Amino acid sequence: VLTFDQSFMGDSAGFPGHLSSPDIFTENLSAAVDFLGLQPLVDREKIGAIGICGSGGFALSAAQCDTRIKAIATLSMYDMSTAVRLGMDKVEIQKAKEKMSQQRWIDAENGYPEYLPFFPEQPLDTVPEGLQEPDAEWFRFYAIKRGHHPHARGGFTTTSTLAMMNFRLLDYIDEISPRPILFVVGDRAHSRFFSENAFKAAAEPKELYVVDDAEHIDLYDRRDRIPFEKLAEFFSNRM
């Protein structure tokens, strides 16, 4: 098993930190396959990918073009290229683009990009009152001891969103077939529609597996909710 932080994220290298790139994040999955395939103990015909949240979308995106990925499972999948446009009409999208485009001038003059972290530097004891969902849910994981980490304070550089708005991740999801896809999602996940929409767009073989009594973040760390046996069965039988 190989796990890694995306470029510019966590303990991985890359400047500027907290940059978000649909191209690089997708390419990182293929680079991981490169590395695995060079290990003497690895069967190149049995390399699969598991992606959680946004990494689920990037894993699917990589599998669209990299046929070396033989099976893909996602948990609480987020399609970030769709997420950045949610709730905005065309006028609002244009205003957002204009604001971020102007921010590029400021970033260029400063010599570094604006980054506004979403979560506190130190973990909170409780989630602040008054937060709306899904922000409150993010705080229930990343802002308290449950999931807080100094290298995971949320968000990306302000202008990173422009790239996500410009390139769609899953336009060719049907081309993953005949390789199998397993979408795992909580029944109470605010992000459930991402998996459901991707499931509809994907070709067979595919499966949508709904976990009872689970919200989005529960599939990050709750061992009583993550369907380990289902995942093990999927990869054992499909590769």
Give the role of each language-model region.
Residues 87-88, 155-173, 190:
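Active-site nucleophile elbow and catalytic-triad environment of alpha/beta-hydrolase enzymes
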Residues 212-239:
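Catalytic active-site module of serine/aspartate enzymes centered on a nucleophile-bearing elbow/loop
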Residues 5-10, 78, 212-215:
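Short beta-to-alpha linker loops that shape the active-site pocket of alpha/beta-hydrolase fold enzymes
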Residues 176-177, 182-185:
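Short beta-strand/loop motif that positions the catalytic acidic residue
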Residues 60-140:
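Alpha/beta-hydrolase-fold enzymes
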Residues 9-45, 221, 225-227:
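Catalytic nucleophile-loop/oxyanion-hole region of alpha/beta-hydrolase
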Residues 187-206:
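Conserved loop-alpha-helix segment in the C-terminal half of the alpha/beta-hydrolase fold
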Residues 36, 56-67, 198:
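Short glycine-enriched nucleophile-adjacent loop
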